[in-house]
Amino acid sequence: MVDVDSAMPLLAGSLIVAGLVTGYYFIRSNGIWLLLLVSVTVVLIFWLIQTLRKGNGLSERRVCVLVLGDIGRSPRMQYHAISLSKHGYSVTFVGFLGTKPHQDILRDDNIQIIAIDEVKGLQVGPRILTYATKVIRQSLQLLFVLMKMDVQSYVLMQNPPGLPSIAVTSLVCSLRSTKFIIDWHNYGYTIMALTHGQEHPIVRVAKWYERFFGRFACYNLCVTNAMKKDLEKNWGIKATTLYDKPPLIFKETPVKLQHELFMRLAKTYPQFQSGDGNVWCETERTAYTGHNPTDGTVTRTPGRPVLLLSSTSWTEDEDFSILLKALEGKGPQKDYYRKLIDALEFEHVKICTPWLDAEDYPVLLGSADLGVCLHKSSSGLDLPMKVVDMFGCCLPVCAIHFSCLHELVKHEENGLIFKNSWELAQQLKSLLSDFPGTKSRLGFFRKNLRASGGTRWDENWDKNVLPLLTAPW
C-alpha cells in the first residue's frame, strides 16, 4: 500500500489543474464566472474535508459498497452486499439505479441504497474538455456523497470504472481512517482502448491513473489468478483472487417452474408460444412445455426446439455477429444486432432478445439446453461471469477463446471453446445433432457439471474476503 498522505498534494493539485483547464476554455468563451465558480468549489471541498475529518467512532460494522455504474447490472457487487449483510455488517450501497437490483437487496434491512446520478461532460468544445468536465462533476458528486455518509469501516469499490472513483475514494478513506478495498474486475484503460486504441493520449493517461492510484488500496481483490499475477508483476499490487462463483439461486429449473416462466414470456414474446400461437388453449402449452389441467402434470413438449441462450451486455467486448454467422452458415450494441437479426431469414431458428427481471434470469438459465458465451476480455485477464452462472445451472457452454479462459471452461469436459464462427457452427451441429437425447456429448457435459458440484459464492466469499475484514487493524 502507498502512503496516502504523501499523495494528497497530488490529488489536490489534480483538482485545481482540472479546474484551471476548464476555466481556461471558458475564459475564451467569455465564461470567466465559471473559473471563479471552480476556484470557490475547490476551497469548499477542502473546508468540507477538514470539517468532516474525524469519524464518529461508530464505524466498526459499516461497509460502503461502491460502483460508479448501474447497481442492477453489477451482480458481483450485489453478492458482496448480501454477504456483508449476512455477517452483520450495515451496508451502504452507492451507485446508479438504472436497473432494479435483486429482491434480496431491496428486502434486506441491513442494506441502504444511495443512488447517484450518471453525469455528463459539456457537450460543446473539444473532446478533452468533455472528459475533463465529466471527471470534475463526478469527482465532486462522489466526494460529497462519501463525506456526507456516516464513517465506514471499509469502502469496497468496483473497478472498472475507476476514473475518478479510485482517487476520490482513497482520499476520503485516508481522511476518515477507513480501509479501502478495490475489487478488480478488469482494467478500465483496456476497455477505453477498444474505442480509442492503445496509444490514444486518454488511454495512456487512464492507464497511468489506474496503476498509480490503485496502489493506495489497503486490500485488493481480483477475478482470476492471471490478473493477480499481472497486478503484482506490472503494478506492484498484491491481490487476493476471488473467483466469481454462482449463488444458490443458480440451479437447474424444475419443469413446472420452466412452464410457468415460458407461459409468462409467451404473452410478450411469440417465440415462446406453442405452434398454434394460442397461449390459453385447453391444455396450456408453450413451445417447450405443456400442462395437463386434468391431472396437473407438466411435461416437456415432444420434438421441442433447442433453447440456446447467450447472455449479452451488448458491449464492444462481445461480437454477437459470431453467433449470427454460425446460425446463418455463412460469413461476410443492441439495435445494431437487432437490425442484423431482422435481416436474416432463418427457416428453423427463432431469435428472441428479451430483458429479464433479476429473479427470472436464473430460472431461464436453468431451463436452457446450451449456453453460448461471446465475451472476449479486453485485458485477457478476466472471466465471463455469465458462464459462471450457466455452470451453476449445470448448463454446458460453447465459449469464444481468450488467454485465461481455461481457468473456467475445460474443453471437452464442461463445454467447448471456439475461435471463430465456423468452429462454433461445427460445434452446434455436433452437440445438437441428436437433441434431445441424453447420451449425447451435451448430456455428457451436463453430467460432468452435476458431478463436479462446485463451490458457491457464500463459501468462496467466507474463505477469501471475510478474513480480510476480521483481521486486526
Stretches found by the model and what they are:
Residues 2-112, 402:
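N-terminal subdomain of nucleotide-sugar transferases
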Residues 82, 143, 147, 164-167, ...:
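Membrane-proximal helix-turn-helix segments that form the acceptor-binding/catalytic region
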Residues 309, 313, 411-412, 416-422, ...:
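Conserved acidic donor-binding segment of nucleotide-sugar-dependent glycosyltransferases
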Residues 370-373, 389-392, 396-400:
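Short hydrophobic beta-strand element within catalytic cores of glycosyltransferases
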Residues 419, 436-473:
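A charged, aromatic-enriched C-terminal amphipathic alpha-helix characteristic of glycosyltransferases
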